[in-house]
Curated annotation (Swiss-Prot):
Lineage: Bacteria, Bacillati, Bacillota, Bacilli, Bacillales
Organism, scientific name: Staphylococcus aureus
Alphabetical GO biological process terms: response to antibiotic
Keyword terms: Antibiotic resistance, Leader peptide, Plasmid
Protein name (database record): Chloramphenicol resistance leader peptide
Superkingdom classification of source: Bacteria
Amino acid sequence: MKKSEDYSS
Protein backbone atom coordinates (compact mmCIF):
# COMPACT_ATOMS: atom_id res chain seq x y z
CA MET A 1 0.00 0.00 0.00
CA LYS A 2 0.98 3.64 -0.32
CA LYS A 3 -0.95 5.91 2.01
CA SER A 4 -4.49 6.30 3.36
CA GLU A 5 -5.93 6.61 -0.16
CA ASP A 6 -4.91 3.00 -0.79
CA TYR A 7 -6.33 1.63 2.44
CA SER A 8 -9.59 0.02 1.43
CA SER A 9 -9.84 -2.11 4.56
